[in-house]
Amino acid sequence: IAAMDMLQGGMSWDEIALLSKAIEAAGASIISTHFTWHESQVPTIATMVPRRAFTGVTKRVRKEVSITVITSNRINMPDVAEAVLVDGDADLVSMARPMLADAELMKKAAEGREHEINTCIACNQACLDHTFAMKTTSCLVNPRACHETMIKWGPASETKCIAVVGAGPAGLAYATVAAERGHAVTLFDAADEVGGQFNLA
């Protein structure tokens, strides 16, 4: 359900609560909440939106029913999801774009390797924008997303010492893949921090 549709003349909270109870009474075992419609033109999943910005609304729905309630939107890392659950805002957390950014997100979290997770930055450019343009979905921070059968790499047949000059997005991506393939990689940049031009965003 749209737990908050942000449309003029849209559903009131009383109507949303009534709908939630009716869904439970009809026999549903789970309610998945989302926020706004595309027509509302209110950002809810863009980078500018704080993480877990709308889970408090899900918590209100949860108080109206006794079945499992799922929340979503701008929950991109395991610690954020865990905080949502600990705070009682939801019973389950829905994550989609973070899985495009890193298909091994859950595995890394379970193994205590959260620092290795390739984080979704909520740019929406290669996932949602591509989808709406009828293009193949992908991810700016993981170009292999939805192209895994075309973009393949395995261990290098011969390992090398590689110097990568430039720690912007392209340099970081190349250095990461080279290291995953077994090469010894040294990354150089004139700046004191990594990120290159992306830091301007």
Name each model feature, range by range.
Residues 1-165, 169-185, 193-199:
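Flavin-dependent oxidoreductase catalytic cores
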